[in-house]
Amino acid sequence: MRKKLLVILLLLVVLIVLVVTRCGGKKDQQNDPADGQGFAQQSGKAELPAELKLGVVTEAESGAMQLEVERNGEKTVYVFSDITINDWYVPAVNYVVTNGLMSGTDVGGGLSLFRPNYGMTRAQLAMILYRFAGGEPVAAPRHTYGDVSSGEWYYDCVNWADTNGYIKPESPDSFGVEAYCSCEEVLAVLHRLAGSPESNASLEDYPYAPKVSETNLSAVRWAWEKGLIAEDECVWYPTQAVSRAQIALLLMRYDQLIGASGEAA
């Protein structure tokens, strides 16, 4: 009887150890999601780089993020009702809003929605990259695409991104303005913006390395080496649609670590 009890106790101990190990393991923090479905949450809070241009963040009475931005001597106050003061992406939202890269939607009553967990289309990414890199309208489009129409809000931005080779078209006839950006696609865009530097960094500690496409492998290696993505965050699934909050964080880190002018020394 005692032997049976001892065996049962040993089995229970092994089972508990396995459960605890799995719950604490980085691969369990984000299951293998269907591409483009949902966004994993970041485990830590983004660091706030003091040397970047930032606004003043306070907590509104409702508990929402309140951001005061000063531009050209005028102050603007944003209250993002869909962001709480403790959300991990608050520093990144501060950065992109203060620097005029992203803003959100005014919903009236002094409130705005940033929609941090929404995806981003390729046209939206082109517009933000255009602002980030200080782009200028090109004299003539490099190529004409069936889904890029003159007069659309994204026209100059898409033509600039296409002409400079930062964002690749989906096909010879379609730029793919309405398609949502994946994580590895955005990393590839930033890699090209930096001049496509070589990187042989190991992705051994990157949980989703086997999921990275061969086309974007060099870009992901570079992003990993530079610290644009980090192993302990468990949110950078290569083929998953990237969120607005994630893009805000990538832009903040790029500016801090590399700078919009190109590759860091």
Residue spans of the language-model regions?
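Feature responds to low-complexity, polar/acidic, surface-exposed segments characteristic
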Residues: 6, 18-90, 103-123, 130-155, ...
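Sec-dependent N-terminal signal peptides
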Residues: 6-14
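Positively charged n-region of N-terminal signal peptides that target proteins for export
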Residues: 1-5
